[in-house]
Swiss-Prot record:
Catalytic residues (positions): 41
Miscellaneous field: Binds one cation per subunit; probably K(+), but might also be Ca(2+).
GO terms of molecular function: heme binding; L-ascorbate peroxidase activity; metal ion binding
The name this protein goes by in its record: Probable L-ascorbate peroxidase 3
Note on how the cofactor is bound: Binds 1 heme b (iron(II)-protoporphyrin IX) group.
Record gene name: APX3
Bias (Basic and acidic residues) ranges: 116-133
Function: Plays a key role in hydrogen peroxide removal.
EC number: 1.11.1.11
Protein species of origin: Oryza sativa subsp. indica (Rice)
Cofactor dependence: heme b
Length: 291
């Protein structure tokens, strides 16, 4: 594993430049779904017991992207390689997770808190750590609990299937989960609760979410309350993107010091208004006394 990057002002500025480039790339290539898939699949190999796998960029190596569950993922890796060359300071691990965050945001999803500083690794985990779409609730829990995630995380993250479609050459399944596979919303859950969503895909792992009573409670909540889904999804996505990763203190210090100019202006304006009100009140009181 390589050394952790130094997350200073220069690194954070590079991250913001990469974020802008990612927005342009995703818009021009309509590749949000596969960018989200890349971020998930790099992170979703984490094992909390052995502290191996996770969002470390190892998916860029053939021994990992050739896993059956990663069929087609090389497309995303290749799309991001020129960007890595433009922003060499940023680690692959950070770039892949940033791509997932941007993919959600530019398609209408929630803003996800992103903290950089991940190390790159060339140590790929053994095959079989990612979810198998042909299995059910017990399998989902086995996979996600191994990562250290919860039932709520399982359902919230499954809502990411609102983006994209399954392809036979990659998974053996064919079709989209929603009517607009390039829009991030809560329609995945709405369709799940319908007995017949004609022309839309429902994998065995999708059906497990409505068949299992604990999972179903979250499905029903997210189907009727998109704000609740967005809130929980953003929280779960952040957890997934930081599995096995301890954000460097320098990143938090930098973020806390970067108060937006608009906010500073609002604060200054607020102080000025408050001062004016106090002065006006003082003058009024003085006039009363003089009268």
């Amino acid at each position: 594993m390589s050394a952790a990057p130094v997350v200073d002002a220069e690194y954070m500025a590079e991250v913001e430049r990469a974020r802008r480039d990612l927005r342009a790339l995703i818009a021009s290539k309509s590749c949000a779904p596969i960018m989200l898939r890349l971020a998930w699949h790099d992170a979703g190999t984490y094992d909390k017991a052995t502290k191996t796998g996770g969002p470390n960029g190892s998916i860029r190596f053939p021994q990992e992207y050739s896993h059956a569950a990663n069929a087609g993922i090389k497309i995303a890796i290749d799309l991001l390689e020129p960007m890595k060359q433009r922003h060499p300071k940023i680690t692959y691990a950070d770039l892949y997770q940033l791509a997932g965050v941007v993919a959600v945001e530019v398609t209408g999803g929630p803003t996800i808190d992103y903290v950089p500083g991940r190390r790159d690794s060339s140590d790929s985990p053994e095959e079989g750590r990612l979810p198998d779409a042909k299995k059910g609730a017990a399998h989902l829990r086995e996979v996600f609990y191994r990562m250290g995630l919860s039932d709520k995380d399982i359902v919230a993250l499954s809502g990411g299937h609102t983006l994209g479609k399954a392809r036979p050459e990659r998974s053996g399944f064919d079709g989209a989960w929603t009517k607009d596979p390039l829009k991030f919303d809560n329609s995945y859950f709405i369709e799940l609760l319908k007995e017949n969503s004609e022309g839309l895909l429902k994998l065995p792992t999708d059906k497990a979410l409505v068949e299992d009573p604990t999972f179903r409670r979250y499905v029903e909540l997210y189907a009727k309350d998109e704000d609740a889904f967005f809130r929980d999804y953003a929280e779960s996505h952040k957890k997934l993107s930081e599995l096995g990763f301890t954000p460097p203190r320098s990143a938090f210090i930098y973020k806390s010091c970067q108060k937006p100019k608009s906010l500073l202006m609002q604060t200054a304006a607020g102080v000025a208004v408050a001062a004016a009100v106090v002065a006006w009140a003082y003058l009024c009181e003085s006039n009363k006394r003089l009268g």
